[in-house]
Amino acid sequence: MTSHPRDAPQFYLTAPSPCPYLPGQYERKVFTHLVGRRARDLNEILTQGGFRRSQTIAYRPACETCRACISVRVIVGDFVPSASQRRVMRRNRDLVGQPQPNRPASEQYALFRRYLDARHGDGGMVDMTVLDYAMMVEDSHVETHLVVYRKRGPDTAINGRGVGAPIAICLTDVLSDGLSMVYSFYEPSEADRSLGTYMILDHIERARLLGLPYLYLGYWVEGSRKMDYKAKFGPQERLMPQGWVRVE
């Protein structure tokens, strides 16, 4: 009879469900729980192996007939922004991002709610309550924090803090080899700012300042309008059957 250490992770497989990225496809996921004293180390290993974190769950696609979801990470030290990305940075130079503990707040949920209603009204997260949001943010056994973006104020250069309501927010995990953008959302009425792109560019710079080699972006899905933007941040590495492969 095979025995397993008490704290060894147990993996499970979900039932098939409609794919949110490719019409006509069905997705399955393999997942495990990130709890206890080894949660941080396990999250490191699994992230490097193509898993993503959601609260205390680490998951990876395990679809029977499709391999379109490919983990991507930006090579921070080699990244050079394109002309359009430099314009996005200039467009948002009136913003400042402040790291803060992963504690939920009512103004965060208000922004989250506006974002979902405007951008993902037919998505699986649209029914999330304030309690669901709180769990998404604070239910974690790994090193994580929020980066909250606000407009610069008269004292920002001194205290590093912005003023007014948050314009964008990212839940970010800190790993030994990089930052991982778990979930980000932004003010839909500020669409001209390209805030999704801006937060990625800002996190690349944050990783560089921390001396971390990678920024994990999650899954790139070729042909999916929801995910195709991730290919614009290069050079990057994509997780293939033979391991991480550099793509210019």
UniProtKB/Swiss-Prot annotation:
GO molecular function ontology, one term from the record: leucyl-tRNA--protein transferase activity
Major subcellular location class: cytoplasm
Pfam families: ATE_C, ATE_N
Enzyme class of the recorded protein, top EC level: transferase
Gene Ontology CC annotations of this record: cytoplasm
UniProt subcellular location: Cytoplasm
EC number from the UniProt entry: 2.3.2.29
Top-level division of the source organism's lineage: Bacteria
Keyword Cytoplasm among UniProt keywords: yes
InterPro entries: Acyl_CoA_acyltransferase, Asp_Glu_LeuTrfase, N-end_Aminoacyl_Trfase, N-end_Aminoacyl_Trfase_C, N-end_Aminoacyl_Trfase_N
Keyword Acyltransferase: yes
One BP annotation, GO: ubiquitin-dependent protein catabolic process via the N-end rule pathway
Reactions it catalyzes: N-terminal L-glutamyl-[protein] + L-leucyl-tRNA(Leu) = N-terminal L-leucyl-L-glutamyl-[protein] + tRNA(Leu) + H(+); N-terminal L-aspartyl-[protein] + L-leucyl-tRNA(Leu) = N-terminal L-leucyl-L-aspartyl-[protein] + tRNA(Leu) + H(+)
Keyword tags: Acyltransferase, Cytoplasm, Transferase
HAMAP family for the chain: Bpt (MF_00689)
Family indicated by similarity: Belongs to the R-transferase family. Bpt subfamily.
Task of the protein: Functions in the N-end rule pathway of protein degradation where it conjugates Leu from its aminoacyl-tRNA to the N-termini of proteins containing an N-terminal aspartate or glutamate.
Protein name (Swiss-Prot/TrEMBL): Aspartate/glutamate leucyltransferase
Organism the protein comes from: Methylobacterium nodulans (strain LMG 21967 / CNCM I-2342 / ORS 2060)
